[in-house]
């Protein structure tokens, strides 16, 4: 990643995901909407993480084209946005299977964690830092990404097989 934006165009799915968070880039008349320049982009900077999460939820990962579009809309240097994206273990920047299971490996879960207890063998298994479920250790977070809401299910399931308390 560099300080200049690459010449890449986001897919329709990526554009739709970003439109949902950042608003559409074109108005109802079809004309390209002016974003308000640097002043408006500076007030939208807090939407970087929600925009990255929207890409992951819809497409499954943050592609170069998706990251470029986020940077263009928020007026953020690509190197900075890439640094944010790669800092978080739950934001993949390369294509991954549509289902990912994050297995907690923090102190409470590490003693009893068993990644072999994951039932979905087609899922990518990632050993992750604390999921915030220490009282239910060992725990995992299953994330299914896709273009429609029923294909994106975020559920937290203890690996022991019991259902978490609501």
Predicted regions and their residues:
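Small-residue-enriched alpha-helical segments and adjacent helix-cap loops
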Residues: 44, 48-136, 148
